[in-house]
Amino acid sequence: MGVAVGDALGMPTEGYTAREISSKFGMVREMMPAPEGHFHSGLTAGQFTDDTEETLLLAESLIDASGFSPDGFAEKLTSWGATWTLDERLNRGVGFATRSAVESMIRGKPWQQSGLNIPTCGAAMRAAPIGLLYHTNLNIVKSYADLQSLPTHTSAAARAGAVAVAVGVALCLTGFSKEMILRNAASQASRLDEYFAERLLWVGELLDLKPEDALGVIRNSPLAAETVPAAFYCFMRFEPEEALVMAASSGGDTDSIASIAGSLFGAAKGSRWIPESWLAVLEGRERIESAALCLSELSSSICR
């Protein structure tokens, strides 16, 4: 649920600078529709983007296969991509790497060859279900978080971002402190990309700065080495609701930053912290709750 509310909260501000958001919206404390002329124009308050859609596709592939199946996940992505030919709006603002990879799979290219060497956050933003399902075994979390990246993203940074998010979610579920979660997520990610891991670990040194200063130096583009550290900063620095408000108001890839932060808080604290005003308008709530429940039940059987 944290992924979806973060995504929907950050949806209308994606692509704006922090200054533009302040001028157009103020602090983003409630769900809002995408502005006219925005690339999410047409989405209403509470609707989510590709971040949540891909997270759900991964979660539902895990449920269908009673575990991770790269073939099954690739099939989910391909079926989703096929809907774009009927209605372009159904891609929900999908990123370039994922769009190109999915279109390649639709044309028959196997998932082992479809991914692009682009260091963006598309694999990280959807990785939370791996951490949820396999949270008692970090080796499996790391392996499968990396593997689920490959149909769309093959760069070291993109894969490291996915590992960091999935490991973070897993450790949130097992009750680690925020400091230990950050260190372990960076350590696991370092085996794929040292630079990414250094930037993630650096977040711990920025917690005494003003939030706008810290997020300004972390930056907030769709690069995994910016989006993922920004999300972890919000997780480390704030309580859940305020973390998502800050993520949605900070500029850049706001929906991904807020959704990743939401995934960490969802694992750590469940959904009790989510304002009812957010949940009341959230798209697909029944589908999201069903997937979360099924994953939790499946995890209980796998992790015994």
Predicted segments with their positions:
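Structured, active/binding-site neighborhoods that engage oxygen-rich ligands
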Residues: 1-304
